[in-house]
């Protein structure tokens, strides 16, 4: 079965599970870094929102031997777990006074998103783009967001500079930074704790995680006023920032003999094998100078003596 045949079959079988009051649609969804995914939405009558269920990975599961029947059952489970109980009043979005407290920012890679950036307000920072979104809701079931586009600014009659001012105030307040050692964090998230020898090894090469409390676009924490300086003072040294994804940075205190070429090679390898394409932030490290209070890109070979 080809991919297009798979999409059609999924849509038909999902439709057979519901009554005629439900609308089943397939959409091409433009994601970060130029990635386009195929999303399935199931709209109940009288409701204007639905979770988007992406089908690309399901096709990989089908190719690996999973039956269409089991895929359909899983999609139904996902929908039932996340389906909305009521509509969202989108009329409020036309009035900026209703929206301004919900405006937040996030970081994406500049070059990988040049086409998208033609349509949205943004500011360049190093090799990143600072872009904006409206956080409609956030819960354990997921987050509802709207990417802010240039057309929004036109009917709001608001400048990109004003947007940034609101986001700079809102984002740290609504998504507070979370900075903690990597291994204790992993132990909290994993069902089984890491062995003691792993903890001892980690203490010799300490790694920290910088994200936000919601783990949502947490890489943007590097924009929070005075945050990097506060981290440098806490560590009492300069440090590297390793872009783990659009949701977090890893912080590595400067160690003698650290080779940037090796560090960047590791980042590239992890991005290629472990991180979803749409969640990649960058393929090299960054350096924060405690004395200069300055963040710089470290894309070239360099060794710290």
Language-model regions, residue ranges each:
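Charged, alpha-helical interface segments at or near domain boundaries
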Residues: 27-209
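N-terminal alpha-helical "arm" segments
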Residues: 1-32, 38-40
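Short amphipathic alpha-helical segments
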Residues: 2-10, 67, 71, 159, ...
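Residue-level signal for secondary-structure boundary elements
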Residues: 18, 22, 83, 87, ...
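Short charge-dense sequence patches
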Residues: 22, 112-116, 213-221
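Short low-complexity stretches enriched in small and charged residues
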Residues: 8, 202-217
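Hydrophobic, Leu/Ile/Phe/Ala-enriched alpha-helical segments that form helix-helix packing faces
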Residues: 10-18, 75, 79, 167, ...
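C-terminal structured domains
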Residues: 213-305
């Amino acid at each position: 079965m080809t991919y297009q045949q798979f999409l059609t079959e999924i849509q038909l079988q999902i439709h057979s599970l519901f009554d005629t009051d439900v609308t089943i649609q397939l959409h091409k969804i433009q994601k970060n870094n130029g990635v386009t995914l195929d999303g399935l939405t199931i709209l109940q009558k009288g409701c204007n929102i639905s979770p988007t269920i992406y089908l690309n990975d399901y096709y990989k599961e089908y190719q690996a031997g999973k039956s269409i029947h089991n895929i359909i059952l899983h999609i139904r489970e996902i929908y039932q777990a996340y389906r909305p109980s009521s509509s969202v009043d989108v009329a409020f979005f036309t009035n900026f006074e209703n929206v301004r407290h919900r405006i937040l920012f996030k970081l994406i890679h500049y070059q990988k998103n040049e086409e998208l950036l033609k349509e949205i307000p943004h500011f360049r920072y190093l090799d990143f783009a600072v872009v904006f979104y409206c956080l409609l809701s956030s819960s354990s079931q997921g987050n509802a967001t709207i990417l802010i586009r240039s057309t929004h600014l036109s009917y709001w009659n608001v400048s990109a500079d004003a947007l940034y001012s609101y986001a700079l105030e809102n984002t740290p307040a609504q998504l507070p930074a979370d900075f903690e050692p990597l291994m204790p964090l992993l132990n909290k998230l994993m069902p089984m704790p890491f062995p003691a020898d792993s903890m001892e090894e980690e203490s010799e090469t300490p790694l920290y995680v910088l994200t936000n409390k919601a783990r949502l676009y947490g890489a943007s924490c590097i924009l929070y006023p005075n945050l990097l300086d506060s981290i440098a003072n806490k560590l009492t040294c300069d440090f590297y920032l390793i872009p783990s994804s659009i949701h977090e940075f890893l912080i590595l205190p400067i160690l003698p003999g650290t080779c940037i070429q090796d560090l960047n090679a590791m980042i590239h390898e992890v991005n290629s094998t472990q991180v979803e394409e749409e969640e990649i932030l960058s393929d090299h490290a960054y350096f924060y100078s405690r004395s200069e209070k300055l963040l710089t890109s470290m894309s070239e070979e360099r060794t710290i003596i």
